């Protein structure tokens, strides 16, 4: 499982700041030849006296460099969403400017150029903004029946009233919301609470602002959240020392069992018995001269017949067969 890494905004500053003015991008504009970005006013003013990129010195255009720059709306939205309060402060400065200079108002300018765009229209959320959310119990059986056509008819008043509405700051984390649910509903500690968006469990460090950005909440209603309660799964930890002791004791029991079986199954005849003892065979039948010891008595190969002596041998010499005795 991949671990999520959180980084500070200061580590992203080199990618969000203009090298000409040293501030965050405002009306981010990118040179199409090298893809370096700057503030619109900064790069336009710079290209009045130069035709080369301020960073890499690539030629923007031979005669009309303003033709090879483009407004980068995606980059500007990222900057507004990452830097707290930047969008609201910029809109306020624009409104103040046009209020102080009415003649500078351009009829063809957009509402954003005049600073008349609200945070809701731009979908920019600030940390101190209050977000309305709804939370209800996640019923798996109800989710399985979601495709039925008569689901609206089957809803009862209890199911409709089961949803609760809250107003929370955008910086509220899922961990805080889980603690609120546990204390509000007296859920024991041996049960785990999962806060979900649709059918996906949310991370504890997610804020309401993160959820609104990740799942593209359109502000057309309360942020819909759900929760479920399930028992906590405890993993049984095995002590390796105990496991090694049990394994050793099992081996000892098996060894003792084999010894008992051997002592019961092998009967060694006594020398005082009237029954003659069977001849002792060498553990090495092909090498009978090697002696073996049984019950402290050494038996030599001399008591056995040597298979290499007193045996007739057939010898062939120049086609004439002769038999000789060893």
UniProtKB/Swiss-Prot annotation:
It comes from the Eukaryota. PROSITE patterns: ZF_RING_1 (PS00518), ZF_RING_2 (PS50089). InterPro entries: RAWUL, Znf_RING, Znf_RING/FYVE/PHD, Znf_RING_CS. It is found in: Nucleus. Residues 290-303 have a biased composition (Low complexity). CDD domains: RING-HC_PCGF4 (cd16736). One of its GO terms (cellular component) is PRC1 complex. GO terms for biological process: negative regulation of gene expression, epigenetic; negative regulation of transcription by RNA polymerase II. A motif (Nuclear localization signal) lies at residues 81-95. Residues 239-262, 274-326 are annotated as: Disordered. One of its GO terms (molecular function) is zinc ion binding. SUPFAM superfamilies: RING/U-box. Keywords: Chromatin regulator, Metal-binding, Nucleus, Repressor, Transcription, Transcription regulation, Zinc, Zinc-finger. A zinc finger (RING-type) spans 18-57. The keyword DNA-binding does not apply. Component of a Polycomb group (PcG) multiprotein PRC1-like complex, a complex class required to maintain the transcriptionally repressive state of many genes, including Hox genes, throughout development. PcG PRC1 complex acts via chromatin remodeling and modification of histones; it mediates monoubiquitination of histone H2A 'Lys-119', rendering chromatin heritably changed in its expressibility. In the PRC1 complex, it is required to stimulate the E3 ubiquitin-protein ligase activity of rnf2. Component of a PRC1-like complex. Interacts with cbx4. This is Polycomb complex protein BMI-1-A. It comes from Xenopus laevis. The lineage of its organism: Eukaryota, Metazoa, Chordata, Craniata, Vertebrata.
